[in-house]
Amino acid sequence: MKYDVVVVGSGVAGPTVARDVAKAGFSVLLVDKKAAIGTPKQCAEGITIEVFKEFDIPYDKRFINREIYGAKIYSPSGYTAELRYKHVSGVILERKVFDKMLAYYAAKAGAEVLARTEVVDVIRRNGKIVGVRAKHEGEPLEIEAKVIVAADGVESTIARKAGINTYAPPHEFDSGYEYEMLIEGYDPDLIHLFFGNEVAPRGYVWIFPKDEDRANVGIGIASDHPQTAKYYLDKWLKENNIPMRKILEVNVGLVPVGGFVKELVKDNVLVVGDAARQVNPVHGGGMKEAMKAASIAAKWIIKALEEENLELLKNYSEEWWRTEGPRMEKLLKLRKAMEKLTDEDLDVFVQLVSGTDLEKLAGGNYLEVVKALMKHPKVLMSRRRLEILKALL
């Protein structure tokens, strides 16, 4: 089997690359180790509304569970800050359907798609990578390709086999645990985020509504914490008198939140999405970031193939670090500052921020918010709070 491009992994990043490159007329094979693309989900399933237009994805109600109008955050002592729009700001997806449809769009664009195909190694000849070795339904398979895209998730095999350093210590990952369950008493038009060092150490509890009385209820905490994410989620549910007898699905996963892979290209191998740790460090979401990286990667793959010059692939890494890197580094800086906050700090800051401030913080445009907070008496009276905020300037 020979192709111009083989894409390993059919989550969000992989099909985006495959679709765009196939549209340009090149032969593409998209493979995924799962028997059913999109399962199991490892995601809270929330995404901003802008993604559909930006990445040319149909707004298809088949994979949209619920439209969302904003967010509400809760401090340890119960103080709240709310951001509510008059228009739809995001949606809660059905990832099992969404991921499969992204693969479908890639196939419609001309890519070939193979599920239940696990890539286990790269093929080297004369010191160069010329393809990948895989197992398709247990049978060995060799796939030759001019370009290889590692979109195979946080534990990327291909990036590592190609010699790209994707290592990160356990502390740089969050452990996620989530129930899809029946739940009442929370506005289903908003996502809800609960903070506190006893609630979710270094993370938060989320409620992402999928229906009037059904939601993804999950938690992310430091993966090296002595207690498990499940322990803290069950504890929170019990403390809030939320029954645990109507759980429809359980999902677990690791989220890379501590930094990004520096070398995104090595020779003819590109790494994108979770495999490159291209995840928003503040909230742990990675779908939009994955599609953005995939779009940049696809652009340079097309140019490299058109000009028969694989050296052009390096421009993907350069462009991502130039256009996305500064914002992502600022968000990482913000996350590290947030990790130092006590419950009292969280109470103070949630009381002081507005809904608009929340939007700016989540997007990395936080300088004016920080400057305003630094003038407030509750911050000025605390040298430690001032130092935490100053570190963000």
From Swiss-Prot:
Gene3D superfamilies: D-Amino Acid Oxidase, subunit A, domain 2, FAD/NAD(P)-binding domain. One of its GO terms (biological process) is membrane lipid biosynthetic process. Keywords: FAD, Flavoprotein, Lipid biosynthesis, Lipid metabolism, Oxidoreductase, Phospholipid biosynthesis, Phospholipid metabolism. A 2,3-bis-O-(geranylgeranyl)-sn-glycerol 1-phospholipid binds at R327, G363. Its cofactor is FAD. Its EC number is 1.3.-.-. It is an enzyme of class 1 (oxidoreductase). GO terms for molecular function: flavin adenine dinucleotide binding; geranylgeranyl reductase activity; oxidoreductase activity, acting on the CH-CH group of donors, NAD or NADP as acceptor. Binds 1 FAD per subunit. One of its GO terms (cellular component) is membrane. It catalyses: a 2,3-bis-O-phytanyl-sn-glycerol 1-phospholipid + 8 A = a 2,3-bis-O-(geranylgeranyl)-sn-glycerol 1-phospholipid + 8 AH2; 2,3-bis-O-(phytanyl)-sn-glycerol 1-phosphate + 8 A = 2,3-bis-O-(geranylgeranyl)-sn-glycerol 1-phosphate + 8 AH2; CDP-2,3-bis-O-(geranylgeranyl)-sn-glycerol + 8 AH2 = CDP-2,3-bis-O-(phytanyl)-sn-glycerol + 8 A; archaetidylserine + 8 AH2 = 2,3-bis-O-phytanyl-sn-glycero-3-phospho-L-serine + 8 A. Is involved in the reduction of 2,3-digeranylgeranylglycerophospholipids (unsaturated archaeols) into 2,3-diphytanylglycerophospholipids (saturated archaeols) in the biosynthesis of archaeal membrane lipids. Catalyzes the formation of archaetidic acid (2,3-di-O-phytanyl-sn-glyceryl phosphate) from 2,3-di-O-geranylgeranylglyceryl phosphate (DGGGP) via the hydrogenation of each double bond of the isoprenoid chains. This is Digeranylgeranylglycerophospholipid reductase. It comes from Pyrococcus abyssi (strain GE5 / Orsay). The lineage of its organism: Archaea, Methanobacteriati, Methanobacteriota, Thermococci, Thermococcales.
